[in-house]
């Protein structure tokens, strides 16, 4: 049995759950109600954009990215604006992060790492040729599509964390130093293209080695290692790969290898295939200007989020590949999120999550919501409990942030979703494993659920 579902809508898009969060933006899964196609929508706080005086740069870079249709770059479909938000409609990429593969399986074979690196360089080179620089290449920005092809996200959208000063060069303070070029850390101004290339080199090293070239618990020592390019190759690295990486991870941007030179490198060229794509398609940039127009006639229609009722069958069908026992399956590949069901009351589930989180140095913030008309046949999507877990001590990629939601399936049955909101994937992996041990006695196995539903 099911009831009417009312979801939050923005224009023609029906918004779903949050799939990512950052300082300036939140990313939600959405569906085009006209075509049924899935998309991702990045939601920016307009006030923050205006406060940082980045309007013109954001408009310019989004305009450029709208014109780019490259097989290895996440595409921007359209941009919408309301009085308070900017909505960037993006291609939805289903394969997860490239670095999830490293977490699950360790380092890659050289030919596999080379293929991904070739696709990364293709994407970076193409965008650089159009004056767009990433400036924040890191694992979260490297996604895989359903065919296993690399997709680079957030090209042209990193300007929110940058500042251009009077010298005309980019300046930034970076909370993710492991992938960042020495000249960026020095904050003396830097060339966006050369900084991107350094990050590509760090990424290639991780693919080949299975670990970071620059790592230290002491931030100043880490900065010194990066500035002097102090790293050691693992013994299995081939000489041609070493030679290329040494030229990319050159701390002097003036002598660092360039992308045209990489394209001629013998190691890089092995098995290289140029990307095939067609740029000849109609597009419009009218929506980019309209986003920052204060006139309400240019604002997209927003509908407030309201409680939604789903039956248990719908809940499972909307959760692609849902395995309610996967939290405790040792063979299950690690992902950025997981779900399970429990017959325990929400407060007991919350207590167990706190038991797992606090010893690991997490601050736990609770939000309670009143349950809306619960009944035996429906799930109330008005979340009864929502937790935000934040690591007090910043890791190598800032503070790990974990979002947890507990939803009622029936008065005696709840579904719990745990996902990484922001921070380092490896850190979340450690938290995930500890959580699985702590919660074993509160999880209701998937076989039990299937018997209940049959």
Curated annotation (Swiss-Prot):
Q: Which reaction does it catalyse?
A: L-seryl-[protein] + ATP = O-phospho-L-seryl-[protein] + ADP + H(+); L-threonyl-[protein] + ATP = O-phospho-L-threonyl-[protein] + ADP + H(+)
Location of region: PPI: 335-364
EC number assigned by the record: 2.7.11.1
A Gene Ontology biological process term: signal transduction
Q: Which cofactors go with this protein?
A: Mn(2+)
Where is ATP bound in this sequence?
Answer: 19-27, 42
Q: What is known of its domains?
A: The activation loop within the kinase domain is the target of phosphorylation/activation by upstream protein kinases. The PPI motif mediates the interaction with the ABI (abscisic acid-insensitive) phosphatases.
Function according to Swiss-Prot or TrEMBL: CIPK serine-threonine protein kinases interact with CBL proteins. Binding of a CBL protein to the regulatory NAF domain of CIPK protein lead to the activation of the kinase in a calcium-dependent manner.
The protein depicted here goes by the name CBL-interacting protein kinase 33
* Originating organism: Oryza sativa subsp. japonica (Rice)
Organism placement in taxonomy: Eukaryota, Viridiplantae, Streptophyta, Embryophyta, Tracheophyta
